[in-house]
């Protein structure tokens, strides 16, 4: 029996999941899990990339027998730079770091956002890689004189496993430096930001084999296997796991971020799309993920932590339901919720600014739950206007698909049936790319049929 290993790393945790086909169904087994999180050092937020590498290797070693292949997916936009000997020459700064605070405005003269969006189709986020690189150029100009290669975080981890350093297309597309039309690095953007062109390597497709493990890694894990490229932006993998039956489905990858959108064959880069801040991220088989980033479970994760981690998410739901009639709402995409010192205080402040009296904890939680559901509904309306299509269902994958209360509120707000599951959407998407590349599955459509037959999909009617 052939098995495949997905390494799926999010902003708060990572997991290694084995997958295999058995009697026409996809089976999963989690074999390793670890915590992740950005760390504050000397005024900047960093990922402990060396620890992540160790965790990835330890998780591979936890396999009882060698899988056919392994692939790594992570969040988008963050990167490292390599020197001439393949060594990392800068830390992995986290996207929530404040170094890009003023960069979009500073670059507006040379890299106007309207022009940038027209070329890349990538939404305005101050932490987009193009702005991170501009911030680093300003803060550490010398590093670019030594830099030979830029690698996104999953590309770097795959490089540390295989010794082969390449740029994978789906994650590269989130940098706001890849041409939406040509699907290659945009040399004009690179020149305007005054970056060395040589650090941007040829873009490679998900599923490509990089080769076996390096001798160093092989020695640690006790066997060899093929290292493949995943659709290495976790959302690109998650969208693959949506078991929608037709083209009229909206996809929602629900985790720390909520990414809600549709698959399109061509990008939408017009002025209205730009004004609504929709993004066109590269997907598997060059299908565009036309979507919007919404703050997602990040707000609830932080509130839980502040209220005491002993409170389960079920407890938060219970508290929120006890104040279900509370009328206060916040813009879940407001800047103040991106990286506040205290999320509860940030929510409280926003509500009191609107004239509400100081909210209780249940009222704050109710506010966030309802605000999230209503933001999904607003996004679907905008999608219909921008694409000229009517959508008939919302399909949720990822950890948030387990949140029954949020799913019920979402179905009601969107006036659409909600199909929730599978939970491990990103890992499943990672696995099916490997299986298609190895010939175990014939196509994405066959994979989605298998997913529908393999996992419980809960339905919430409006």
Predicted regions located by residue number:
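Short acidic-aromatic active-site loops that bind/stabilize oxyanions
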Residues: 45-53, 122, 126, 203-207, ...
């Amino acid at each position: 029996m052939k098995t495949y290993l997905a390494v799926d790393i999010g902003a708060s945790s990572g997991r290694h999941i084995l997958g295999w086909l058995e009697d026409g169904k996809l089976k999963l087994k989690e074999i390793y899990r670890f915590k992740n999180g950005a760390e504050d050092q000397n005024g900047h937020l960093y990922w402990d990339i060396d620890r992540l590498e160790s965790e990835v290797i330890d998780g591979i070693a936890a396999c009882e027998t060698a899988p056919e292949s392994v692939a790594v997916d992570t969040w988008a936009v963050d990167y490292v730079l390599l020197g001439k000997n393949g060594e990392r020459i800068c830390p992995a700064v986290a996207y929530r770091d404040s170094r890009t605070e003023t960069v979009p405005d500073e670059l507006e003269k040379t890299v106007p956002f309207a022009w940038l969006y027209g070329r890349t189709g990538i939404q305005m986020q101050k932490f987009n890689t193009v702005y991170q690189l501009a911030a680093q150029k300003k803060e550490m100009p010398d590093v670019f004189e030594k830099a030979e290669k830029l690698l996104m975080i999953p590309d770097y981890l795959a490089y540390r496993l295989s010794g082969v350093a390449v740029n994978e297309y789906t994650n590269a597309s989130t940098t706001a430096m890849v041409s939406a039309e040509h699907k290659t690095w945009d040399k004009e953007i690179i020149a305007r930001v005054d970056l060395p062109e040589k650090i941007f390597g040829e873009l490679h497709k998900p599923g490509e084999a990089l080769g076996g493990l390096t001798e160093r890694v092989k020695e640690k894990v006790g066997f060899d296997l093929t290292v493949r490229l995943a659709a290495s932006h976790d959302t690109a993998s998650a969208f693959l796991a949506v078991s929608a039956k037709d083209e009229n489905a909206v996809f929602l990858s629900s985790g720390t971020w909520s990414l809600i959108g549709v698959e399109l064959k061509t990008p939408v880069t017009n002025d209205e799309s730009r004004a609504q801040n929709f993004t066109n991220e590269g997907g598997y088989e060059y299908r565009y993920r036309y979507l919007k980033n919404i703050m997602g479970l990040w707000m609830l994760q932080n509130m839980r932590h502040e209220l005491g981690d002993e409170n389960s998410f079920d407890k938060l739901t219970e508290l929120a339901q006890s104040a279900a009639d509370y009328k206060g709402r916040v813009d879940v995409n407001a800047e103040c919720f991106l990286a506040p010192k205290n999320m509860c205080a940030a929510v409280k402040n926003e509500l009191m600014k609107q004239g509400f009296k100081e909210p209780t904890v249940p009222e704050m939680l109710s506010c966030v739950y309802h605000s999230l559901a209503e933001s999904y509904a607003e996004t679907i309306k905008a999608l219909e206007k921008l694409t000229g299509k009517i959508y008939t269902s919302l399909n949720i994958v990822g950890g948030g698909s387990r949140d029954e209360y949020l799913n019920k509120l979402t179905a009601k707000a969107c006036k659409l049936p909600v199909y929730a599951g599978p939970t491990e959407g990103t890992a499943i998407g990672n696995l099916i790319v490997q299986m298609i590349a190895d010939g175990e599955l014939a196509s994405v459509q066959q994979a989605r049929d298998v997913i529908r037959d393999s996992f419980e999909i809960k339905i919430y009617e409006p």
